[in-house]
UniProtKB/Swiss-Prot annotation:
CDD domains: GLECT. Pfam families: Gal-bind_lectin. It comes from Caenorhabditis elegans. This is 32 kDa beta-galactoside-binding lectin. InterPro entries: ConA-like_dom_sf (IPR013320), Galectin-like (IPR044156), Galectin_CRD (IPR001079). The keyword Repeat applies. The gene is lec-1.
Length: 279
């Protein structure tokens, strides 16, 4: 069982962004390389998804032949000054590259770890197209998210129906002690409490009914790391919640209440949130 069905995207890949790239949003690119890989690039363009002379606010070039990742911009017909850093991606391995936009910079994250900040040289609002080229297999491209307050609380208009999944993208704070994700019932009870505790090195799972906690479940290691990003997926199945962390199945939590009665979401603790989805 997998939290995410693998897809295959054509390379070269071209896409038009339907809305403006705004601060808080993240571009997620996942794929894999081959042993013969030399280079691949991710580009954020203005006006067209090619190099016909229009500006390129961000050029990310992953170079195995040089052992570097190179960041640059193309403006007014000229490339700017390159910013280089050692390439942590290995030939033949899968990779996860995220580009999060902020008011003054792009935050580049490689395999869930902060890689480098790149200050804007062109307006973020000028970005309209995306291109991905080179020696890679591409299996996931997603753009979205925003700045989320923590604590975060929201009703779920359509609930979390059986067969659907909650996706939470975030980064654990470097001095984190705990965070939690709660799925709420209509009456305010907590159908599922998911609580990574770094001070105890466990992840607590529980439920709350009529103001009383049930029996804790805490088997298994804590798969989250301080200062490192994560993808958390909670699948609502008929008999249990299935939990995946960074694409790997983690635990199952048998339902203690009606699985069709999920009406709200709470997220709190020592994390930065970058995305929340239901799919």
């Amino acid at each position: 069982m997998s939290a995410e069905e693998p897809k295959s995207y054509p390379v070269p890949y071209r896409s038009v962004l339907q809305e403006k790239f705004e601060p808080g949003q993240t571009l997620i690119v996942k794929g894999s390389t081959i042993d013969e890989s030399q280079r691949f690039t991710i580009n954020l363009h203005s006006k067209t998804a090619d190099f016909s002379g229009n500006d390129v606010p961000l050029h990310v070039s992953v170079r195995f032949d040089e052992g570097k990742i190179v960041l640059n911009s193309f403006s007014n017909g000229e490339w700017g000054k390159e910013e280089r850093k050692s390439n942590p991606i290995k030939k033949g391995d899968s990779f996860d590259i995220r580009i999060r936009a902020h008011d003054d910079r792009f935050q580049i994250i490689v395999d869930h770890k902060e890689f480098k900040d790149y200050e804007h040289r062109l307006p973020l609002s000028s970005i309209s197209h995306l291109s991905i080229d080179g020696d890679l297999y591409l299996n996931h491209v997603h753009w979205g998210g925003k700045y989320y307050p923590v604590p975060y609380e929201s009703g779920l208009a359509n609930g979390l129906p059986v067969g659907k999944s909650l996706l939470v993208f975030g980064t654990v704070e470097k001095k984190a002690k705990r965070f939690h994700v709660n799925l709420l019932r209509k009456n305010g009870d907590i159908s599922f409490h998911f609580n990574p505790r770094f001070d105890e090195k466990h992840v607590i799972r529980n439920s709350l009914a009529a103001n009383e906690w049930g029996n804790e479940e805490r088997e298994g290691k804590n798969p989250f790391e301080k200062g490192v990003g994560f993808d958390l997926v909670i699948q609502n199945e008929e008999y249990a919640f299935q939990v995946f962390v960074n694409g790997e199945r983690y635990i199952s939590f048998a339902h203690r209440a009606d699985p069709h009665d999920i009406a709200g979401l709470q997220i709190s603790g020592d994390i930065e949130l970058s995305g929340i989805q239901i799919q």
